[in-house]
Regions:
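Conserved helicase motor core of SF1/SF2 NTP-dependent helicases
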Residues: 7-9, 15-30, 34-37, 50-56, ...
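Coupling/switch/interface segments within P-loop NTPase motor domains and analogous charged loops
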Residues: 69-181
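Conserved P-loop NTPase motor core of helicases/translocases
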Residues: 27-29, 35-91, 189
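Alpha-helical structural motif
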Residues: 19, 48, 52, 78-81, ...
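Short glycine-rich substrate-engagement loop in P-loop NTPases that contacts/grips substrate
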Residues: 179-190
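Walker A/P-loop NTP-binding motif
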Residues: 1-4
Length: 313
């Protein structure tokens, strides 16, 4: 675009504020030289580096105040969500389970009784985000009709779903009491704003020519649904994303095919061009040497360390 003297707007999405600052630092030399600019004043080629939370807040404009965010950082926000979900789960296990267990499946009851509460809370958080909020729009009747996710909470019958929805209500009450909105509330509200006649008219002018997404595996399906609505074109999606599907923290069961479908629809999935990295670029040789030294030492590494507790005694 620069060689042709054509305008080009790029959006670079990071998952957390720390990552955003690091990415912006990498582009700082080009920004200082005026090769690209943040606002279009110095160059026709513009770059916007931000987090999805911040971008969605800009879309919502003045409809949400700073104090209503769980946290501006998506990672911290999701950790707070998990704590609220754990509290809601424990309340439901204590108050609702005794009266509802006779209507619930044996498999789901065994899961609730045998699995660690933190693990169940993570699965419930995913159920709330993707199914109850994302697909059912917090409608109880719609949720009961939805099929179980392949990698989701192991609900088998309507009684299981009733219990999960009661846990969601306990979670929602905690958000209401604190006067805050979680990441999914903000993203889904922004999606509503991006599906209006006003945005469809403005899209060709205010959308992005290209979008780059870092650590895509950390985003859930609700969050990924935003990106194909903010490109200039509504049928071509010039999106570049990096993903480590072995982590799959944002959503359960991510693989290469489901990523392609989420980032452009099944009709666009065949047009993607994957690049598989077999080398590790994150670690410098010094860090690799240190890691090798630690693993080679085994348990003997810790035998010569000073014990401050023993000295205190």
């Amino acid at each position: 675009a620069q060689q042709k003297g054509m305008p080009h707007s790029t959006l670079f999405i990071a998952h957390s504020e720390a990552t955003r600052r690091n990415i912006e630092r990498l582009f700082r030399p080009e920004l200082d030289l005026g090769v690209i600019s943040m606002d279009g004043a110095m160059s026709l080629q513009t770059l916007k580096v931000t987090t999805l939370n911040t971008y969605c807040a800009e879309v919502l404009n003045t409809e949400i105040s700073e104090t209503e965010f769980l946290d501006r950082d998506a990672f911290e926000s999701k950790q707070t969500q998990l704590l609220y979900t754990l509290e809601a789960l424990q309340e439901s296990l204590s108050n609702e389970l005794p009266t509802h267990k006779e209507f619930m499946s044996k498999g789901f009851l065994d899961y609730l009784n045998s699995e660690d509460h933190w693990v169940i809370a993570e699965m419930l958080q995913h159920e709330i985000s993707v199914k109850i909020k994302g697909r059912a729009e917090e409608d109880e009747a719609k949720y009961y009709k939805l099929p179980r996710l392949r990698y989701g909470l192991p609900v088998e019958n309507e009684g299981d779903r009733v219990f999960a929805f009661l846990a969601f209500r306990n979670y929602r009450r905690r958000l209401e009491n604190s006067g805050q909105f979680d990441t999914d509330d903000i993203v889904l509200s922004a999606l509503g704003q991006l599906n209006t006649p006003i945005w469809r008219r403005r899209r060709a002018r205010e959308g992005f020519d290209s979008i780059f997404i870092d650590e895509t595996h950390l985003f859930n399906l609700n969050e990924l649904s935003v990106f194909h609505r903010i490109t200039k074109s509504d049928h071509l999606f010039p999106i570049v994303y990096s993903a480590d599907v072995s982590q799959s923290l944002g959503d359960r069961g991510w693989d290469d095919e489901t990523f392609d479908e989420a980032m452009g629809g099944s009709d666009q999935a065949g047009n993607s061009q994957p690049t598989v990295f077999k080398s590790i670029f994150r670690c410098s040789p010094e860090i690799v040497d240190l890691a090798f030294s630690v693993t080679s030492s085994g348990a003997t590494l810790f035998t010569n360390f000073h014990d401050p507790v023993a000295a205190a005694n």
